[in-house]
């Protein structure tokens, strides 16, 4: 992998982590009629989506992009089954690690049939497969074109800024999860500032999703 390709991979991790957070907020607003700031972190980001898409791009990208030699229906099949397997594994491993580290579940499929530990279930695996088709066959090719025009220096700065914010949020959220944030006033202030921003986005995205769903 070239340096430029690595920079793009990091960039797309943050792009899809943010888009995943938006999807989670919209889904929660539509299904529960409540505005819920989803995710483990305080900022508007769900890293598990970024991880899933990064792996899918690396593994499935050359088979699902329009430039591949396969027919369109083959692209769709590869994206569906490959994406379903990858996202299910990411969800299982990610959910298990988070539960073991923080003794908290950020999603629970225990109410669905044939679930495994509440971390994965066939119903959502199928949904992830459909979502993978949309992302790999439609969304990612569209995003790849403008992102390819980003100069290397700009891409470096974007990755550094997003990476710094992500690392700070990760540390603050981990401290909060183990219950130390109350003893560290500055950490708690930083957490609240991050949460305020993502709460504002939650209201915008959740309200918009409900309006679109009911219109």
What are these regions (language model features)?
Residues 1-7, 61-79:
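Helix-coil boundary and interhelical linker segments in multi-pass alpha-helical membrane proteins
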Residues 3, 31-58, 62-65, 100-140, ...:
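Functional transmembrane or membrane-interface alpha-helices that line membrane-embedded catalytic
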Residues 4-11, 40, 75-78, 115-118, ...:
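Membrane-water interface of alpha-helical transmembrane segments
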Residues 10-26, 47-55, 59, 63, ...:
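Hydrophobic, lipid-facing residues on alpha-helical transmembrane segments of integral membrane proteins
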Residues 65-71, 142-149:
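Membrane-interface helix termini and inter-helical loops of multi-pass transporters
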Residues 149, 174-208:
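Charged, amphipathic alpha-helical linkers/stalks
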Residues 155-183:
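Alpha-helical transmembrane segments and their immediate juxtamembrane interface regions
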Residues 213-214:
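Conserved small/polar residues in nucleotide/adenosyl-binding loops
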């Amino acid at each position: 992998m070239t340096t430029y390709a690595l920079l793009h991979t990091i960039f797309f991790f943050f792009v899809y982590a943010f888009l995943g957070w938006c999807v989670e907020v919209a889904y929660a607003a539509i299904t529960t009629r409540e505005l819920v700031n989803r995710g483990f972190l305080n900022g508007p980001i769900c890293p598990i989506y970024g991880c899933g898409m990064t792996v899918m791009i690396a593994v499935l990208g050359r088979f699902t992009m329009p430039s591949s030699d396969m027919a369109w229906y083959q692209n769709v099949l590869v994206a569906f089954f490959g994406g379903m397997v990858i996202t299910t594994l990411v969800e299982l491993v990610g959910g298990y690690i988070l539960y073991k580290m923080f003794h908290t579940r950020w999603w629970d499929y225990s109410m669905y049939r044939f679930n495994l530990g509440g971390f994965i279930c066939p119903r959502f695996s199928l949904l992830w497969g459909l979502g993978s088709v949309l992302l790999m066959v439609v969304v990612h090719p569209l995003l790849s074109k403008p992102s390819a025009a980003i100069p290397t220096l700009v891409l470096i700065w974007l990755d550094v800024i997003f990476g710094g914010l992500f690392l700070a949020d990760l540390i603050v959220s981990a401290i909060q999860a183990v219950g130390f944030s109350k003893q560290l006033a500055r950490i708690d202030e930083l957490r609240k500032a991050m949460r305020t921003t993502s709460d504002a986005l939650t209201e915008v995205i959740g309200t918009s999703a409900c309006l679109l769903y009911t219109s």
